[in-house]
């Protein structure tokens, strides 16, 4: 939001002729950053394009690309080989819990729900194996390992920071994660179904609504709901496969490449000196139409 606004202001004040491309990383068009003077909006889906049109963004400035991810999320992985490298069982469905974060505060409730889940994991011994990714949080990793050891869990693995997350996701059958735009997009591209854990607000709430309305994810807010959902998925594996199929509607594995190509085309295109977007001016005010979506 800050970058888009500041960059547009700089171009207005200086009159320089450089293209501005906005790439939102959630499934919602926020109210503060869209500005019709931007040259291109690369959005995740048609719903986002629909919110830009009342803001008088011209159709030629809207491109539905999906949300970009790293290139390794486009690769095909040998699941048995990845599992062997990580010492994960071949005969169980892998449930990946993404609990690591640079800022642990947003994950407090998420981790609390996982802690409450741990004593019940014995009930999935014959079906599911759980992989908890603690990231760079050594204290949390130590806590998880101690809990798993005290509970005698044979179907749980705790990992620290994982360099090749795309490979781990591709080797998994289900992910438990928060509803951040980049996280859910990586899961979509890695073709791993999702259980979105925790209450969601702002853009993340829209991410939840988008994914669950399409049947591409399940949403739970408490440890009890999480346990019930896992029992359902363990009993009916077809439900996870259905999420995978429905998620293909939102999957854009080539988004980063498409955005880069669109940006290069803008750079190469001749600039019209008379274009009001490139004229030096102090401010610009315009009044849009009725919003497509209200929240």
Indicate where each model-derived feature is located:
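A short alpha->beta transition loop at the rim of the catalytic pocket in nucleotide-sugar-dependent
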Residues: 172-173, 191-193
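Short alpha-helical segment that forms part of, or immediately flanks, the ligand-binding pocket
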Residues: 166, 184-190, 209
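Donor-nucleotide binding loops and adjacent catalytic segments primarily
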Residues: 81, 89-171
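Acidic donor-binding loop of glycosyltransferase active sites
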Residues: 170-179
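C-terminal "capping" alpha-helix adjacent to the active site of nucleotide-linked donor transferases
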Residues: 213-214, 221-238
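C-terminal amphipathic helix plus adjacent low-complexity
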Residues: 237-295
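A nucleotide-sugar donor-handling region in carbohydrate enzymes
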Residues: 39-102, 135-139
